[in-house]
Amino acid sequence: MAVKKLFGTSGIRGKINSEVTCELALNVGKSLACYLGNEGTVVLGYDTRTTNVMLDQAICAGLLESGVDVIKIGMVPTPLVGYATDKLGADAGVMLTASHNPSQYNGIKIWNANGMAYTSAQEAKIEEIYSNESYTSVSWDKVGSLRVNEEIKGRYIDDLVGMVNIKPGLKVVIDCASGAGSEISPLVFRKAGCEVTTLNSQPDGFFPGRNPEPNAENLQNLMKTVVAIGADLGIAHDGDADRMITIDENGDISPFDSLLALMSKEFDGDIVTTVDAGLCMDESVKGNVLRTKVGDVNVAEVIIEKDAAFGGEPSGTWLHPDFCMCPDGILSGLRMAELVSNKGKLSELLLEIPSYPNIREKIICSKEAKTAVMENMEDLLKDSFDDIKEINSIDGVRLTFNDDSWVLVRPSGTEDYIRITLESKDSTKAQAIKETCVKIIKENI
């Protein structure tokens, strides 16, 4: 039987009741249990999406039926699932979330015992078990047990606060998108000594205040609020709070690459990032910059392999190996608050980071068409540009030009898009590169 592809760059994700169903969740639970040897313990959490009520029951049933114990920790941020899996000595963790996707989406992400997301090799094993239906039920006396753990939230909060030293009174506005960080993130910042104003901090899976994707279009209210109350910093989370984006004291959204470079400067040692990160990383950090495929698990793997000090994606997904191998938007926000508290205004700190014209574009492309479009992308791009210095095909196709301009064309692993990311010290050239790439993609869809 052909193996069904379930996982993208960030777990399983799709539209509810068409791509992601209770049957799928049940059988993923059984498949995970089989992978674990029909024994052990799994931590289970979920974000604020309304459809998590049914998915939670379904995947839990699959795990229990197959002999695995389940620890439910309820509605929590994704990083708390990674943290709990590690601290409670579980064999795996499961988070039900579609992160920044709209309300009609949901998904499943699986975590290792150390709090790191499942690797692509592990996900492939789950897909093989799922596709072949090679999972089995256990006898009645070997069915897994279910318990609820509410104490781990408090432990997580205390450990987060202990990671930073923020001067009392820093004014912070936190926009949680009505997502999984709504309860914990503001509480953590208050316990850390900040004066906190909240936006969209009532959990609601319909995301009534704003779309959970933390970008400039969706953060207009946060930008205005930071200026209106004279705050030092704005923090925006996505739907499950594994990401964080900042607004400076002037109400401006921080450039994603520059923000990552600013935090990376604080660490000695090597830094891991992805192929879509900009030149400012290489020009700012103390150690080596190691690039890998997009996706937090890819960053985590290289952090472990190279014993790196810190890692992250320009999207605001940052990993702090001194805390947990799960990306943590709340800790990322705390560390930015600590930086502003001790070193000055965010806008001025960002001026220290080199900044060049950077363009991010996305072209709608169905899942079925993405593979075909990307098949010949390297040749199409090579035929369209004549000053190429280097080609990197670790994740999509990245061209670096003789003047260090670069462009990355890659299929989204979570949505129906092909993404273009590019950077050049010459804004005219940046625009020309973008137009050429858009034309190539549209002509081949």
Swiss-Prot record:
PROSITE patterns (UniProt xref): PGM_PMM (PS00710)
Protein's gene: glmM
Positions with a binding annotation for Mg(2+): 99, 238, 240, 242
Coiled-coil segments on the chain, per record: none
Cofactor(s) for this UniProt protein: Mg(2+)
Task of the protein: Catalyzes the conversion of glucosamine-6-phosphate to glucosamine-1-phosphate.
E.C. code: 5.4.2.10
Listed PANTHER family: PHOSPHOMANNOMUTASE
Gene Ontology BP term (one): carbohydrate metabolic process
Family statement: Belongs to the phosphohexose mutase family.
Pfam family, one: PGM_PMM_II
Alphabetic keyword roster: Isomerase, Magnesium, Metal-binding, Phosphoprotein
Protein name: Probable phosphoglucosamine mutase
Post-translational modification remark: Activated by phosphorylation.
Positions annotated as active site in the UniProt record: 99
Modified residue annotations for Phosphoserine: 99
